[in-house]
């Protein structure tokens, strides 16, 4: 195996493990909190918002630690190992007052690995525009494996999801040590607070096209999290069997569109491809909205919304990461990836999850319907 092939294989396994962890708990946490712990809708929204808090802490951690003191692969290893321990402690937290802060601690450890992993991959791949989507494709496979793994051993309402994710996180941490050495770029340099926080990347906002791109990403993130916060609760109330396995079709779609993304970027460019991604999100919510009316087409509409995931995610977020990498010069590339992570998984996620939880709480029914629905979908 050539050195290039070996690198791609290691990065692919890294992406697989990283998203296996996420997939093993993120979708199923909603039913777990609603059914097992009896949390209210607003509390469920806040719990999903913990990921956003982690994303807002992430640029500081990456800017302060990764760029100045330690190699990226070592930070990934430490965060993976610590994150695994925290995940295994989460099932002990059965009240919101204990669960919420523990989840924030975990997210503060996990979210930085997303930007660090992307930055490390883009640094070492010789042709990022072609190779990065192929490597990143294994993240979708990892998410599917996480969902199927949980579905095979337990239900979505079970705390087992956190033990599964915790074990995977420990493996992820150990495997990270096999990644190519990526030393800090600013060792011994005097670094300003602005550089630590990644504020240098804000210079990109002077370009109108980049500013519009960031605004669109922020706005689309708000409704995006209605899907992640509410879908699991919605399908649980509809009494969907094998819910985790069925929702994993979203990641099957993800794999397909990962493979198609290089063609679309060559044929249409970033602007049109990203617009297609936004249009697919609109179509997805129309499908889910009409599915709430019930009827013979309900299942078809829900599956349509699930299968649109690949185009929704890859044409918008993966294309967006590649666009940012192309727009930023080498000096601020890491900060630029941190900026987009802050927008996508930070501010946008926090606003989206908060609103999604409030809307879920507002539409809770005083008494479940004859069909067992606890919310007015």
What are these regions (language model features)?
Residues 2-52, 209-248:
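Helix-loop boundary and gating motifs at the non-cytosolic
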Residues 154, 166-186:
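C-terminal membrane-cytosol helix-exit motif in multi-pass small-molecule transporters
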Residues 1-5, 179-216:
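Juxtamembrane intracellular "pre-TM" segments in multi-pass secondary transporters
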Residues 57-71, 153-154, 256-270, 360-361:
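Helix-to-loop junctions at the C-terminal end of transmembrane segments
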Residues 57-94:
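Conserved MFS/SLC helix-loop-helix module at the cytosolic interface between two early adjacent transmembrane helices
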Residues 152-168, 358-377:
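A membrane-interface helix-boundary motif in multi-pass transporters
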Residues 104-138:
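Cytoplasmic helix-loop-helix junction between adjacent transmembrane helices
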Residues 74-88, 272-287:
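Structural signature of the two symmetry-related core transmembrane helices
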């Amino acid at each position: 195996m050539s050195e290039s092939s070996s690198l791609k294989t290691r990065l692919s396994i890294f992406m697989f493990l990283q998203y296996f962890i996420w997939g093993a708990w993120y979708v199923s946490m909603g039913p777990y909190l609603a059914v097992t712990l009896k949390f209210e809708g607003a509390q469920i929204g806040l719990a999903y918002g913990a990921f956003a808090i982690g994303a807002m802490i992430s640029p500081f951690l990456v800017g302060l630690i990764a760029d100045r003191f330690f190699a990226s692969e070592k930070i990934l290893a430490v965060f993976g190992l610590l994150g695994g321990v925290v995940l295994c402690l989460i099932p002990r937290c059965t009240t919101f007052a204990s669960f919420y802060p523990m989840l924030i601690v975990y997210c503060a450890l996990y979210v930085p690995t997303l930007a660090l992993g992307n930055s490390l991959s883009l640094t070492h791949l010789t042709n990022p525009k072609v190779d990065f989507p192929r490597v990143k494709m294994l993240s979708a496979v990892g998410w599917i494996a996480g969902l199927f793994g949980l579905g095979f051993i337990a239900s979505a309402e079970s705390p087992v999801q956190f033990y599964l994710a915790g074990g995977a996180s420990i493996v992820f941490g150990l495997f990270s040590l096999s990644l190519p050495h990526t030393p800090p770029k600013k060792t011994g340099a005097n670094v300003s607070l602005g550089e630590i926080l990644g504020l240098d990347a804000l210079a990109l906002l002077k370009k109108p096209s980049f500013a519009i791109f960031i605004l669109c990403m922020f706005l689309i993130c708000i409704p995006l999290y209605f899907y992640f916060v509410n879908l699991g609760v919605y399908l649980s109330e509809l009494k969907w069997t094998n819910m985790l396995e069925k929702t994993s079709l979203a990641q099957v779609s993800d794999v397909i569109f990962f493979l198609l993304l290089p063609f679309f970027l060559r044929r249409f460019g970033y602007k049109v491809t990203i617009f297609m991604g936004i249009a697919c999100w609109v179509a997805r919510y129309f499908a889910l909205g009409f599915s709430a009316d019930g009827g013979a087409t309900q299942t078809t509409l829900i599956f349509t919304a699930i299968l649109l995931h690949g185009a929704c995610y890859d044409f918008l977020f993966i294309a967006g990461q590649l666009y940012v990498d192309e727009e930023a010069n080498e000096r601020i590339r890491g900060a630029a990836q941190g900026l987009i992570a802050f927008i996508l998984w930070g501010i946008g996620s926090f606003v989206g999850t908060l609103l999604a939880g409030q809307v879920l709480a507002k539409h809770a029914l005083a008494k479940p319907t004859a069909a067992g629905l606890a919310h007015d979908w």
